[in-house]
């Protein structure tokens, strides 16, 4: 087994004390064990740091970084990817859930299919109260939140993803060299553009195809009250101008990038 593992699991965290231990326990219980976990704490004000430090002391596959200043979410996502030295990489949201064979199934597919740059499991949405009760918000029909993008033609791949218009595939397992090429967080770490995850996927489609594995599952937590994108942008301290013109910024970037 490679000391650094085959895949880096990047977990950017901020005030996740209620769920982070359970999330890491779920990851370390995966059927596939050849990994490194990198946790980057963006100056949490709760007990996230204390919990993560304790966990990392008990498992040498877990590397923990604490930052004395909150550098913002984009910066934190970029930080964990920048530290990756393995063949594969995946971003993890602290409150989402994988099926037990998520890593095993998706890595196996990428190992056997060189023309694919990323792979994710079929996806459903849920809401979890922190008493550990889980409520399925909506049963996901096939390819509702993620879809295979497997055309050999780059332009057709881009068009397919633009028509699909969902950002969940940002949480795919990627080939590290390809996601570092595509990483919008590195290109513009403090740029107030809401669609950074969407832009990253569009860029990586230049390099290859995206797969959806129907035998593994990615369960994405969403708010039961369905906060709007605008409210979430306000929470992240986007300015009114950035919120108003976020779509314009994306369009400008897209036409510059793809012509």
Task: Please place each PLM-identified region on the residue numbering.
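Nucleotide-sugar donor-binding/catalytic module of glycosyltransferases
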Residues: 1-233
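C-terminal, non-catalytic tails of nucleotide-sugar-dependent glycosyltransferases
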Residues: 151-152, 173, 239-259
């Amino acid at each position: 087994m490679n000391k650094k593992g085959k895949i880096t699991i990047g977990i950017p965290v901020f005030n996740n004390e209620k769920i982070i231990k359970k999330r890491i326990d779920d990851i370390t219980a995966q059927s596939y064990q050849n990994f490194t976990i990198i946790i980057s704490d963006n100056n949490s004000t709760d007990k996230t740091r204390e919990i993560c430090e304790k966990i990392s002391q008990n498992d040498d596959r877990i590397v923990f970084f604490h930052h004395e200043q909150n550098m913002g979410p984009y910066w934190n996502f970029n930080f964990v990817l920048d530290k990756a030295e393995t063949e594969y990489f995946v971003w993890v949201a602290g409150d989402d859930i994988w099926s037990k064979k998520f890593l095993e199934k998706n890595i196996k597919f990428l190992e056997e299919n060189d023309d694919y740059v990323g792979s994710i499991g079929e996806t459903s949405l849920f809401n979890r109260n922190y008493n550990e009760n889980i409520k399925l918000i909506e049963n996901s029909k096939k390819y509702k939140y993620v879809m295979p993008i497997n055309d050999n033609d780059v332009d057709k791949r881009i068009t397919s993803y633009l028509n699909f218009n969902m950002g969940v595939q940002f949480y795919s397992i990627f080939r590290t060299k390809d996601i570092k090429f595509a990483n919008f967080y590195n290109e513009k770490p403090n740029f107030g553009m809401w669609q950074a995850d969407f832009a990253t996927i569009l860029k990586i489609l230049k390099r290859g195809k995206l797969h959806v594995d129907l035998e593994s599952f990615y369960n994405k937590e969403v708010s039961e009250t369905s906060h709007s994108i605008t409210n979430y942008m306000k929470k992240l301290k986007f300015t009114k101008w950035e919120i108003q013109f976020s779509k314009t910024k994306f369009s400008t970037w897209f036409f510059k990038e793809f012509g």
